[in-house]
Amino acid sequence: MQSWQKPLVADFRSVVGEDQPVPLHMWDTASREVTPLTPSDEATVYVCGITPYDSTHLGHAATYVTFDVLNRQLLANGHRVNFVQNVTDVDDPLFERAQRDGVDWQELGEEQTDLFRQDMANLGVIPPTSYIGAVEAIPDVIDMVSTLLDNGSAYVVDDPTYPDVYADRTATPQFGYESRYDEATMEQFFAERGGDPDRPGKRDPLDSLLWRAERPGEPAWDSPFGRGRPGWHIECAAIAARYLGSHFDVQGGGEDLIFPHHEYSAAHVEAACGVERMADHYMHTGLIALGGVKMSKSLGNLVFVSRLCNAGTDPSSIRLALYAGHYRDQRNWSDALLAAASRRLALWRTAVETVHAHNDADSEARARRLVDDVRQALATDLDTPAAVDLVDEWAGSIVDKEKIWDLPGVDGKNAHESLSVPVPCAAPATDDKLSVAQGKITILDDGKDSEADAKSVELASATAGTQRCGAHSHASGELTVDLLPAPHQRGDAPSALYSHLSPAAALVAGCVDALLGLKL
């Protein structure tokens, strides 16, 4: 399956002029502690992909941006990265959505996968080395199920009508080590998350489906154990083992996949390949909430990346908003969060431009210290909040933030005749309205309130595709801001992305690009 176009990414080692790796320490769900992540020359990562419907909401984005940041730290340390990601393009939820909407399940899957690709490209996520659909992996699934049947780790239920194949959960004595849940919690999550504990003929309620015998109206493929289709967990197990082997560095995904999905996919690989532990690290992202309620397809309270981008939101603002919380925490998405990220991005861009215009030895020394500190923060369990704070501190020492936000019509301040410094492309969250047209932003103080979601999109739109602004005050009280193109819009090669900047500015912009995927 085709992935998406690779973004232009600054080469970190070329930017900083050194090749000294920084030791990585990442949280491991199985041990419940931060432990060293020590790949060989080739780092190996498997991240569970989407079931292609309702793509791409911010819960998805949070997960894939997180593992993109991990990918970038591995690359900065000089590793080759073998990054594998799947698409669950044959599964019950996909069939149910297609039936609800009256469309073909394959067409729905292809359409939503295309949308996901576009969203990942817009967010600047580095594409996986291998992007594999479950359908194309069915031969690998059949091979693994056959192995599990042959070595006694699986069995066929005694049902002449639907002879499904199940994994014996006792086949691996270490089963449960990843989630560390007790039996009652396992049974609860198994029932809630696609399991069938009450299926007649099973040896144990927690035995998981490997191969579902053909049912009327469902897709099916030939196999030595009858026509049917794969279970959910065996799909990822077969893909991971095929493209990464029986043991690799990181298995990742959202925390709702810890059990049953990741527990079982690891157990299937371990039982089929005779290994004790599939991955060195099991990493999981916290869930994203809207208004304090978890975003979910069932509740329908989803915020979509494509809608934000279509409204003009700078993708870097979306990434930066997600960085405000640690990837393992439960995070709440809000209009204010996105607006704050847009203002922060504008501040950083203005600081880079200011340093570019006034480069000196002290600026270069401070920029290099910043790069070292940001790298260390991210090497410590991807601590993006700490990294963001570090860049904030650096930018705040360069740009007079009081002057930056002292705009006509903002927060009830009086209009000024002129501004003494360039201003970022967004103002603080207020009731003022922004209009974007023909490469200019106009901030209007009409005294009227605006809806929170519209205000967020407008504020975020203000920095869309921009690097810095110049401001012009008018007697009418309007402030018109010229938008200048960001580096990623100029079509530069990765090695030349920041060659137009002074050494200090290039250090900061290149670091933020290479490590965080943000375009300054």
Curated annotation (Swiss-Prot):
Its cofactor is Zn(2+). A motif ('KMSKS' region) lies at residues 294-298. GO terms for cellular component: cytosol. The keyword Transmembrane does not apply. L-cysteinyl-5'-AMP binds at residues 48-51, 63, 86-88, 232, 254-256, 288. The keyword ATP-binding applies. One of its GO terms (molecular function) is cysteine-tRNA ligase activity. It catalyses: 1D-myo-inositol 2-amino-2-deoxy-alpha-D-glucopyranoside + L-cysteine + ATP = 1D-myo-inositol 2-(L-cysteinylamino)-2-deoxy-alpha-D-glucopyranoside + AMP + diphosphate + H(+). InterPro entries: Cys-tRNA/MSH_ligase (IPR024909), Mycothiol_ligase_MshC (IPR017812), Rossmann-like_a/b/a_fold (IPR014729), tRNA-synt_1_cat_dom (IPR032678). SUPFAM superfamilies: Nucleotidylyl transferase (SSF52374). A motif ('HIGH' region) lies at residues 50-60. HAMAP family: MshC. Catalyzes the ATP-dependent condensation of GlcN-Ins and L-cysteine to form L-Cys-GlcN-Ins. Belongs to the class-I aminoacyl-tRNA synthetase family. MshC subfamily. NCBIfam families: mycothiol_MshC (TIGR03447). Monomer. This is L-cysteine:1D-myo-inositol 2-amino-2-deoxy-alpha-D-glucopyranoside ligase. The lineage of its organism: Bacteria, Bacillati, Actinomycetota, Actinomycetes, Mycobacteriales.
